[in-house]
Amino acid sequence: MTIKGKYMRLSSDSLSSYLSPNLADNSVVCLMAPTASGKTALAYELYNSGRYELISVDSALVYRDMTVGTAKPNAAELARYPHHLVDIIDPMQSYSVAEFVNDVARLIDSCHQNGKIPLLVGGTMMYYMALLDGLSPVPDSDDSVRARVEQWRQDEGISALYDYLGKVDAISHERLNATDTQRITRAVEVYLQTDIPISDWQRQPKQALAYNPNQQWHALAVMPDRPWLHTRIEQRLDIMWREGLVAEVISLLEHYPLTPGLPSMRCVGYRQVLEYLVQTNHPVFEQPHLDKAQFYDAFAQSEPSSNESKEQDTTIQSSITQTHLPMATAQTEALACQQMQNKALYATRQLAKRQYTWLRKVMQLSNTAAVPTTESITASSTSTVGSDDVTDFQKNKLILHSFSTMEQARAYLV
């Protein structure tokens, strides 16, 4: 067993000795894993045990009518396996990390009151980091300021907000991409509301739900073999194309006043379909509630999806841009479709790569708060750490553990 700061890692032997098969009534479990790794199947099994309630930790599942591309459980599955924080906003709305943390805090209390263990399951690692490592105390948005900034963005474009940010918060201006609508808008809102740059707020001490002295947090990171995961990703994408991801995006454009910079439209899969629809000059962009120019400008200079397909994508892009027909020819459309699928596959693999990086970061969490060390516990007992000592010490500390398969995580939780 190793102990580091406020957090503790347990060996496999320690797990079986001190934790299995039961978790404490005040437990909170985070099941963290990359996309397509089998989290949902395990979550369903755990729900059937009667011990858990499910809380989604997925920034894409919050959106209504975005089902195929997010691998969201269907209506029948959601009825049988209820998930908190699924289908809570429309695709043109935003949902901040702070809002997520506040919602989770409320839901954890509710689960415990119901005699259940909250199982936080999903792949949005930024959400997990906010829960486990904390958020800087940036003030919540003021509705009037938000409306003012949104009107400014609509009138003058995100570039105007980005230029303004450069004058009032050089650190954020340098850190953010000029097209990152959500974060630029938020940074401007914070400055107008507080007269303090968001970069200053972000340097202040963090506050994490996992520090709650009345709860026992277990953070489980499942990091499967990458070749196995890549095969699973390909299989999942094949299912999405067959189930109608392109049709789903067209339906979203028909029913919502979307823009290409919205967080929902930057989700992996949806972004690539949008680009495909632009390249094939799809008539959906003639909808009166859509700004066609915004979409075409957003994809005017698309990047090849990977080094391996760079030459192929360049040829495809050339064919698409040279057509003068109202709609792309069948051949050009087929090429654009292949490009879309290539890019979606590459983007999903890159997402998984980032998730692995985040998981490793989570497993290195530490806190400088003064707590007993392994040596001090040992010295105060005998030559070894007894089970009672460990039980006393592990109380109200975040327990970190990593697995290479979902089956190992299952054995920990069932």
From Swiss-Prot:
It holds the Pfam family IPPT. Gene3D superfamilies: 1.10.20.140, P-loop containing nucleotide triphosphate hydrolases. GO terms for molecular function: ATP binding; tRNA dimethylallyltransferase activity. ATP binds at residues 33-40. The record marks 124, 146 as: Interaction with substrate tRNA. Its cofactor is Mg(2+). It is an enzyme of class 2 (transferase). Catalyzes the transfer of a dimethylallyl group onto the adenine at position 37 in tRNAs that read codons beginning with uridine, leading to the formation of N6-(dimethylallyl)adenosine (i(6)A). Keywords: ATP-binding, Magnesium, Nucleotide-binding, Transferase, tRNA processing. Monomer. GO terms for biological process: tRNA modification. SUPFAM superfamilies: P-loop containing nucleoside triphosphate hydrolases (SSF52540). Its EC number is 2.5.1.75. Residues 58-61, 182-186, 266-271 are annotated as: Interaction with substrate tRNA. This is tRNA dimethylallyltransferase. NCBIfam families: miaA (TIGR00174). It catalyses: adenosine(37) in tRNA + dimethylallyl diphosphate = N(6)-dimethylallyladenosine(37) in tRNA + diphosphate. Substrate binds at residues 35-40. Disulfide bonds: none annotated. Belongs to the IPP transferase family. InterPro entries: Dimethylallyltransferase (IPR039657), IPT (IPR018022), P-loop_NTPase (IPR027417).
